[in-house]
From Swiss-Prot:
Record GO biological process: tRNA thio-modification
Family stated for the protein in its record: Belongs to the TtcA family.
Name listed for the protein in its UniProt record: tRNA-cytidine(32) 2-sulfurtransferase
Task of the protein: Catalyzes the ATP-dependent 2-thiolation of cytidine in position 32 of tRNA, to form 2-thiocytidine (s(2)C32). The sulfur atoms are provided by the cysteine/cysteine desulfurase (IscS) system.
Pathway(s) annotated for this protein in UniProt: tRNA modification
EC number assigned by the record: 2.8.1.-
Binding site for [4Fe-4S] cluster: C122, C125, C213
């Protein structure tokens, strides 16, 4: 076997391993949080970025193999950003044979009119986009709205809220809208961003860059994301441990009286489910072990560059 053939075989093996891991993670998230039920119509929000492409691709595969029946419709919100390649998503969606709808709303013009030059547009843009997507879901009869946020997004949101908002709050894997009419799910909740990056490169998704928000420097989220990436490089496994912590919360050892009845603690009473007193003990922490998921980087260990389209 030639060296080229060996390399291709290894890349195929690594891609299959990556694909299985992503499908397994999405399937587990759907099961753990009851994201998709029999008879659901899932509206997958497609932006043209790596995350939403991967989400749609994985859900389409699971649709063919799941023990339940559910429909998928892809929706893209064309916000009329200058230079947005309107042909890319329709061509891609038609090529894979999925039902889709392109919603055209000039939110870009509204944002530029309302937000002074140099200020962050994310908040207003997000509110406008959310309202339009909720309306579209109602029009399509969708029972679930699927977004492409992943594990790293959830961790970044947790730290953003701690650093700037004074809250222990992240992105929930499943939520209901304020009016109770829409259920939003995040099936990529267990997926690492670096896995999604590798998958998007291997699949050669026609990535569309975001010129509206991606060009804004010094965003708080970007600062937090860089911090997390630094930790991941310097301390492998730290992000996995932190995400595990989000799923293992001991309310009796936090400080929120709204969530735990500290005033109700009385002499001689033992409350079920509460960990014992560790006030005078040296806390023993056993490092968590995670499976080795090392694999070939499809970007040849260089900075990942997506194939952008115009």
């Amino acid at each position: 076997m030639t060296q080229l053939a060996q390399q291709e075989k290894k890349q195929t093996y690594n891609f299959n391993k990556l694909q299985k891991r992503l499908r397994r993670n999405v399937g587990n998230a759907i099961t753990d949080f009851g994201m998709i039920e029999d008879g659901d119509k899932v509206m997958v929000c497609l932006s043209g970025g790596k995350d939403s492409y991967t989400l749609l691709d994985i859900l389409l595969n699971l649709q063919q193999n799941a023990p339940i029946k559910f429909d998928i419709v892809a929706v893209n919100l064309d916000q009329k950003q200058p230079g947005f390649p309107e042909h890319v998503l329709p061509e891609y969606l038609e090529s894979i044979g999925v039902d889709y709808k392109i919603v055209q709303e000039n939110t870009y013009g509204i944002v530029k009119e309302k937000i002074p030059e140099g200020k962050t547009t994310c908040s207003l843009c997000s509110r406008l986009r959310r309202g339009i997507l909720y309306r579209t879901a109602t029009e399509l009869g969708a029972t679930k709205i699927a977004l492409g946020h992943h594990r790293d997004d959830m961790l970044a949101t947790l730290f953003l809220n701690m650093f700037y908002g004074g809250k222990m709050k992240s992105m929930p894997p499943k939520l209901i809208s304020d009016d109770g009419k829409q259920i939003v799910i995040r099936p990529l909740a267990y997926c690492k961003e670096k896995d999604i990056e590798k998958y998007a490169i291997a699949k050669e998704f026609p990535i569309i860059p975001c010129n509206l928000c991606g060009s804004q420097p010094n965003l708080q989220r970007q600062v937090v994301k860089e911090m997390l990436n630094t930790w991941d490089r310097q301390y492998p496994g730290r992000l996995e441990t932190m995400f595990s912590a989000m799923q293992n919360i001991t309310l009796s050892h936090m400080c929120d009286p709204k969530l735990f009845d500290f005033k109700g603690i009385k002499h001689g009473q033992l409350i079920d489910g509460i960990e014992g007193d560790t006030a005078f003990d040296e806390e023993k922490i056993t490092p968590m072990q995670f499976e080795d998921e090392d694999q070939t980087d499809f970007s040849n260990n260089e900075m990942i560059n997506f194939k952008e389209v115009n």
